């Protein structure tokens, strides 16, 4: 009887340890299924909702489970002035360093401007952050939006333009 009880307790303990290990999150770039769950279908910005392009969505999750996501939006319903600034959404649950500038957790719009700046705006279209982006002329296959790991951070690409993003 004692052996049976010990086996049951041992099995239960191993099961609990296995469940705890399975629930641990490791830092990673989000896959398509994770993005489907996290990315909104529409995004409110400057008094309007814009459809979000899920096919052009990227993100990462940190070891503590917090996420940051970016996606392009269809900004055709906005004024020309806003379309020139606002290309996508940026939602972060953690503080970020973007091109050397700090960004608090929150929901934002972003855009790679023609003047060489990556701009982040609050949802009222007020500028929050501006940093110089880089251009990768050697990039063979540019895509609308891509995220790659880069040391302790990431590079967010829009075509051949990119900006460094690091969780703080």
Question: What are the roles of these predicted feature ranges?
Answer:
Residues 1-10:
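Bacterial N-terminal signal peptides that target proteins for export
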Residues 13-22:
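Hydrophobic h-region of N-terminal signal peptides that target proteins for export
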Residues 14, 52, 82-84, 102, ...:
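A generic structural signal for short, solvent-exposed coil/turn residues
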Residues 19, 60-64, 96-97, 120-124, ...:
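Short acidic, glycine-rich loop/turn motifs
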Residues 23-81, 130-168:
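Primarily secretory-pathway and cell-envelope proteins
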Residues 67, 97, 102-104, 127, ...:
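Short, solvent-exposed loop/turn motifs
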Residues 75-123:
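Mid-length scaffold segments of soluble, non-membrane domains
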Residues 110-142:
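Acidic, glycine-rich flexible loop segments
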């Amino acid at each position: 009887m004692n052996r049976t009880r010990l086996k049951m307790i041992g099995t239960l303990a191993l099961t609990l340890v296995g469940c705890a290990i399975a629930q641990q999150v490791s830092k990673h770039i989000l896959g398509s299924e994770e993005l489907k769950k996290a990315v909104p279908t529409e995004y409110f910005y400057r008094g309007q909702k814009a459809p979000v392009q899920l096919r052009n969505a990227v993100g990462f999750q940190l070891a503590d489970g917090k996420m940051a996501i970016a996606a392009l939006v269809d900004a055709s319903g906005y004024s020309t002035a806003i379309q020139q600034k606002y290309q996508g959404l940026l939602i972060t649950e953690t503080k970020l360093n973007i091109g050397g500038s700090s960004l608090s957790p929150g929901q934002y719009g972003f855009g790679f401007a023609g003047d060489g700046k990556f701009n982040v705006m609050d949802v009222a279209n007020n500028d929050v952050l501006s940093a110089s982006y880089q251009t990768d002329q050697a990039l063979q296959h540019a895509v609308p939006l891509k995220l790659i790991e880069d040391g302790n951070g990431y590079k967010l690409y829009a075509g051949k333009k990119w900006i460094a993003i690091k969780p703080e």
